[in-house]
Regions:
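N-terminal assembly/interaction segments in proteins that build large macromolecular machines
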Residues: 1-161
Length: 161
């Protein structure tokens, strides 16, 4: 079963890559307000056609991502947005933490911590709060495969009191 999931994820990524240069002409903006109204997550999810934008599964995807944004407070959409200065500062902290680790394992430990640091802060790499077996990026790639057209998270915002 796990092997099948891996194959499906690879197929979704390939499908998304093939559609990457298509124009996005439709989409939706969705907001999720957490109980009490103190936290709001909002997203703009774009697609190629109005037909897909009106689809209930597409709307549910956007709402789920908005809920995730409210809950997890991602700092970056993708790794491309992470500043070098942030990585340098994180690496310095992790190197200090790994000072007592033996030389052979130190580099591997630091790289593992950096990967974890990025996974916690980059929205497209975060495990979805309602289904931690897939990331937000994998969910979007699955939507590309399901709908047969390009789907892209254009913008997200988290507001809190």
């Amino acid at each position: 079963m796990e092997k099948a999931k891996v194959i499906l994820r690879k197929a979704s990524a390939i499908s998304a890559l093939k559609k990457a240069d298509r124009e996005l002409a439709a989409g939706i903006a969705v907001a999720y307000t957490h109980a009490g109204g103190a936290v709001v997550g909002a997203v703009v999810l774009a697609c190629e056609t109005d037909f897909v934008a009106k689809n209930e599964d597409f709307k549910a995807l956007a709402y789920g991502i908005a809920m995730h944004v409210a809950a997890m407070n991602p700092q970056f959409k993708s790794r491309l947005e992470v500043q070098d200065s942030d990585l340098v500062a994180a690496r310095a902290v992790f190197e200090a933490e790994a000072a007592n680790v033996n030389e052979a394992n130190r580099a591997k430990a630091i790289e593992g911590k950096i990967e974890s640091y990025l996974r916690e802060r980059v929205l497209l790499e975060q495990p979805f709060i309602k289904d931690p077996t897939q990331s937000i990026g994998e969910m979007i790639n699955s939507a590309v495969q399901k709908f047969g057209e390009k789907v892209e998270l254009v913008r997200y915002e988290r507001l809190s009191v």
